[in-house]
Design a protein with these regions (language model features):
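Extracytoplasmic ligand/sensor domains, especially the bilobed periplasmic-binding protein
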Residues: 115-233, 282-307
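N-terminal secretory signal peptides
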Residues: 1-14, 24-32
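Segments of small-molecule ligand-sensing domains
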Residues: 332-345, 356-422
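Extracellular/periplasmic periplasmic-binding protein-like sensory domains
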Residues: 148, 273-349, 361-362, 424-430, ...
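Beta-alpha junction/loop-to-helix N-cap segments that form part of ligand/metal-binding clefts
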Residues: 59-66, 78-158, 174, 235-242, ...
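Hydrophobic alpha-helical
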Residues: 124-135, 240-241, 247-250, 254-275, ...
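Extracytoplasmic "Venus flytrap"
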Residues: 48-71, 93-99, 122-123, 201-212, ...
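C-terminal segment of N-terminal export signals and the immediately downstream linker at the start
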Residues: 11-12, 33-52
Length: 442
């Protein structure tokens, strides 16, 4: 695999070891009260949170302020862990949709803000550099909203050599995998009569390289299912000309288009496709079409475009923190913001569910090793579904660090002046109700 990996050199002494050394020095001078129970009990737990508040991935963070605001209300009186009550602070950082910036702010959270844990959830470009920094510094990290392969395999020293893959000690990730989205997409395609010719849009980033990988990505599975895949090759994000891809798809008579690209790139591709007369019967693209604002940018031509669906108000789950249902959380956001619900709402909320649950079981939430161990033992029903690490639903080599959540597929249907998400494929997660059948693009 040629996944792009972001590595950052470890300094000679990481934060955890430095603090251990300082503690030893204080003990030698007889000033042990600095690290005594009275001070520790009064010290708040600091949770770091990284997301792309600005830049091309900003749609993933659109609901952050609402979700974080609700969480702060829930913990305003602190959380009880054992016999002690801890105040909770959430320190947020903007990755600016830039992997290098994501690593920088993770480092700031660890060394300047002294957080006990970092939460992150918005594509590999945000997750991977943050998780890499946390693993180096021995700070627990929980991530989500990226296929698990991009997180576990993409962060390995040699992603192309499965024999060299090793589990991580401090970083944990939950979401669905490429095997799930392939099943969802093909399940939707089977509902529409096509020639099974598929055009692929795979950019030169962690997602694109993973999805287009000839061993673990789309190509081998689609070939086995009888689909002919046309992959014109990798392209850079924020490309302004998709002429070569459109030409290749027309040459292959592609009636299906798939891929995993950022929202502005799909808008460019789709507008140019319409201008050039390329009109496939089915378009199922990940990442770009998750948000109603992205589909609205396409005008009426966005009707019946399909995508993966990881969370909706109709998901039959509730929060372990507040007890609110998925429907209630989505309604709360719409009432507070005046905007339509978006999928990340549920997953950002769930990050704090998993974090609080682990902190309560860790005993000492400031003990990184104990907290990491508690995260790895998580078996929690959340607002996005069960989060269970060590499950047999994940290949053994990744089970320590990865948990899977349910995935369905759906289409955007024009409803007056807005688009509604209609779930059209749920074979892999029948507990999530269907809203209708697949329809071909007009």
């Amino acid at each position: 695999m040629t996944s792009k990996i972001f590595r950052y050199p470890a300094s000679g002494v990481n934060r955890r070891r430095l603090l251990q050394g300082l503690a030893g020095g204080v003990a030698a001078t007889g000033a042990m009260t600095l690290f005594g129970p009275a001070v520790r009990a009064a010290k708040p737990i600091k949770i770091g949170y990284v997301s792309p508040k600005s830049g091309p991935l900003a749609a993933f963070a659109e609901a952050d302020d609402f979700v974080l605001g609700e969480f702060r209300k829930l913990v305003k009186d602190g959380i009880k862990i054992g016999a002690q009550s801890y105040q909770v602070e959430v320190v947020t950082k903007d990755s600016q949709s830039n992997p290098n910036r994501a690593a920088e702010v993770a480092k700031e959270l660890i060394t300047r803000d002294n957080v006990s844990i970092i939460l992150v959830g918005a594509t590999p470009e945000t997750n991977n550099p943050v998780a890499t920094q946390c693993e180096l510094e021995q700070i627990p990290c929980i991530s989500t909203v990226a296929p698990w392969q991009t997180n576990f395999i993409g962060r390995q020293a040699n992603p192309g050599d499965p024999k060299s893959w090793k589990p991580f000690d401090y970083t944990f990730h939950y979401f669905w995998g490429l095997e799930d989205v392939i099943g969802v997409f093909t399940g939707m395609w089977q509902q529409v009569a096509t020639n099974k010719s598929v055009g692929a849009l795979f950019p030169n980033d962690a997602d694109g390289n993973a999805w287009g990988d000839k061993v673990v990505g789309f190509p081998p599975v689609l070939a086995k299912e009888g689909y002919k895949l046309t992959d014109p090759g990798r392209f850079q994000n924020l490309t302004d000309d998709f002429s070569s891809q459109i030409s290749a798809f027309r040459g292959a008579d592609a009636e299906i288009v798939t891929g995993v690209i950022i929202p502005p790139d799909f808008t460019t591709f789709w507008n140019q496709s319409r201008q050039k007369g390329f009109k496939p019967k089915v378009v199922s693209v990940a990442k770009a079409l998750l948000f109603p604002t992205s589909v609205l940018a396409l005008g009426k031509s966005g009707n019946n475009i399909s995508t993966e669906v990881w969370w909706t108000p109709s998901h039959p789950y509730k929060s372990s923190l507040s007890g609110v249902s998925a429907a209630e959380l989505a309604k709360g956001y719409e009432q507070a913001s005046g905007k339509q619900w978006t999928q990340p709402i549920g997953f950002v909320h769930s990050l704090f569910e998993v974090a609080v649950d682990a902190m309560k079981r860790a005993g000492d939430p400031t003990d990184g090793a104990a907290l990491a161990k508690a995260i790895g033992a998580t078996k929690l029903d959340t607002i996005v579904g069960p989060v269970v690490f060590g499950s047999d639903k994940v290949p053994p080599f990744a089970a320590k660090n990865i948990a899977k959540t349910p995935l369905v597929g759906g289409q955007w249907r024009l409803n007056g002046e807005k688009y509604d998400m209609v779930v059209t494929e749920n074979k892999q997660a029948p507990q999530i109700p269907l809203g209708g059948d697949m329809q071909a693009l007009s």
